[in-house]
């Protein structure tokens, strides 16, 4: 018979979020919601500044970030074309709750 580890129950509370990455204005970063997946590392983004952009997931983040519809991400709009952006960060559920409490998300 195996011993059961303490604290491994599924009903344990979610960890408290202490640090959350916020968009940096000096880098022109904006919060965005993933609208739809377009395929080929591309997504439709509804940005918080009111612009709908086509987002690109860079190759360095492709395998590390699994993005689904409805996820909250940080996007950096392109300097050349404002209708396109790079996805640079994806938030987890506790981080999204923190953003909502602090007023970053409407």
UniProtKB/Swiss-Prot annotation:
MF terms (GO), sorted A to Z: RNA binding; translation initiation factor activity
Gene3D superfamilies xrefs: Nucleic acid-binding proteins
Keyword Protein biosynthesis recorded: yes
Keywords for this protein: Initiation factor, Protein biosynthesis
UniProt-listed Pfam families: eIF-1a
S1-like domain residues: 18-92
Region Disordered, annotated ranges: 1-24
Origin: domain of life: Archaea
Endoplasmic reticulum found in the keyword field: no
PROSITE patterns with a match to the protein in the record: IF1A, S1_IF1_TYPE
HAMAP family: aIF_1A
The protein's role, per its UniProt record: Seems to be required for maximal rate of protein biosynthesis. Enhances ribosome dissociation into subunits and stabilizes the binding of the initiator Met-tRNA(I) to 40 S ribosomal subunits.
Family: Belongs to the eIF-1A family.
Protein name: Translation initiation factor 1A 2
Taxonomic classification: Archaea, Methanobacteriati, Methanobacteriota, Stenosarchaea group, Methanomicrobia
């Amino acid at each position: 018979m195996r011993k059961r580890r303490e604290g491994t129950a599924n009903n344990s509370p979610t960890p408290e979020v202490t640090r959350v990455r916020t968009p940096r204005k000096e880098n022109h970063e904006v919060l965005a919601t993933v609208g739809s997946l377009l395929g080929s590392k591309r997504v439709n983004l509804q940005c918080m500044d009111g612009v709908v952009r086509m987002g690109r997931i860079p190759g360095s983040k492709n395998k590390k970030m699994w993005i689904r519809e409805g996820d909250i991400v940080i996007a950096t709009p392109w300097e050349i074309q404002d209708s396109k952006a790079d996805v640079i960060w994806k938030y987890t559920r506790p981080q999204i709750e923190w953003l909502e409490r602090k007023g970053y998300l409407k």
